[in-house]
Amino acid sequence: MSSRTICKSGFDATRGELLKFRRLGFLLSVFGSLGVLTLLIVGFAWSRAEKHSSSMNLTTGFDMALFFLGILTLCICASYTAQEYTYGTLRNVLVRTPSRQAFLIGKLSALSALTLLLTLYTFLLSTAISLFMSGRHGINLTPSLEGKALLTTLAHCLNGFLGTMALGIFGIALGLIARSPIIAISLGLLWSLIIESALGGALPRIGRWLPTANFESLAQSGATGFSYIHCLSLSAFYLLVISLPALYLFKQRDVSQ
């Protein structure tokens, strides 16, 4: 297929994938749970902060909420990718769009758009809560919304999207490999929440080299012991490592069965 045909097929596939997110139940559950947890996390963080404390800033609550957003994105991406095999819809999709490359472009584009929307939603909600709570603690956060500080704040939001999307791509790769939503989600959560935590606790020196830790640090524009370049480079490396076998299996597997 020509590049022009692939682009057109990819655009059509993206539009088709986006239509899957229009279900009211899905939107209410995702945005509702994310909104409630963001409110609780940011509100709790500010309730424990001392008055006139310098440890709280405009993006502190956003950084805390990013952990749940990343896990949620991983689960959504893994589920929406693997269910194409479980429900047998991949075969029907490839009949209309024979190019598997175009299908992956559509899947990745749609999930990226959803992740961007969820990141902006979390950022705006956490910012609104922080601005409201800061007044009660005698902290002025409005300078963070002016001049160069605003650009820094927006860059922080962009990094939040990049780190969250890294977890999303990790979920997509697991979905392609496992071909089962339950298995893909279980593997993602097992590695991210249990195995990495155990490895980081038992061997602190390797903590800064683990994939999920770098994804999360990238989302927070770098963290203690994690430079931004370090997080960005390792995140790209780990995504390449997990994506190559996933793409190979997706290309070679027979989807007619």
Regions found by a protein language model. Give the residues of each.
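Short, membrane-interfacial amphipathic segments enriched in basic
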Residues: M1-R15, I206
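Secretory targeting signals
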Residues: S2-C7, F26-L27, F31-Y80, L104-A178, ...
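Helix-capping/transition residues at the boundaries of transmembrane alpha-helices
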Residues: K20, A82, V93-V95, G171, ...
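Short loop-to-helix capping motifs
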Residues: L24-G25, P98-R100, R179-P181
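Transmembrane helix segments
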Residues: G43-R48, A178-E216
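Transmembrane helix boundary and interhelical loop/hinge segments in multi-pass membrane proteins
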Residues: C77-V95, R100-Q101
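Amphipathic cytosolic juxtamembrane alpha-helices at the membrane-cytosol interface
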Residues: T97-S109, L187
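Short cytosolic juxtamembrane segments of multi-pass membrane proteins
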Residues: Q252-Q257
